Amino acid sequence: MNKAIFLDRDGTINVDKNYLYKIEDWEFIDGVIEGLQILQRLGFKLIVITNQSGIARGYYTEEDAHKIFDYMIKELEKNNIKIEKVYYCPHIGDECNCRKPKLGLFYKAQKDFDIDFSKSYAIGDKVRDLAICDKENIKGFLLNEDEKIENPRIQVCKNLLESAKIIEKRNG
């Protein structure tokens, strides 16, 4: 079985600009490249799981979403970082099982990549990004120092690089 890092996108990898879909608006958060390189070097599969309700709201199309996903993947590849896959929910509301905090996309990724949750981590800037930590034996990092969280498996950090360095100390 494999170990993975489940990454949120907006506010975790890139600067959160509401309903981002234009390449010219893309901006990596400082330290993301270095953090992802550390995690990849440790043997983690890097998997993005993101809510993209802007599609259902009509702000942009699925094609627009795929263009920005492809751009992100190509930019990371320039730094020898491989994103295994981007899983996304295009819906609004609770009618589906794929919109975080629901766990459908996590379980799909687990099946697709033979992931051992007990050796994996989830990283996101919102509590809903880490709902998997409540249901499975997976550790998480909340990249929002203003949030308070009671789950002992979740640690608050300021950014992805800080969380990667903590994971490196635990797994290095």
Model region roles, listed by residue range:
Residues 1-45:
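Active-site neighborhood of HAD-like aspartate-dependent phosphohydrolases
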Residues 7-9, 50, 124-125:
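Active-site flanking residues adjacent to catalytic metal/cofactor-binding acidic residues
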Residues 9-11, 90, 144:
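Short, small-residue-rich loop/turn micro-motifs
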Residues 17, 22, 54-59, 92-96, ...:
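A short acidic, helix-capping loop that chelates divalent metal ions and anchors anionic groups
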Residues 23-27, 60-68, 100-101:
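Alpha-helix N-cap and loop-to-helix initiation/capping positions
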Residues 32, 36-72, 82, 87-94:
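Substrate-recognition element of Asp-dependent hydrolases with the DxDx(T/V) motif
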Residues 67-84, 93-122, 126-172:
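Asp-based, Mg2+/Mn2+-dependent phosphohydrolase catalytic module
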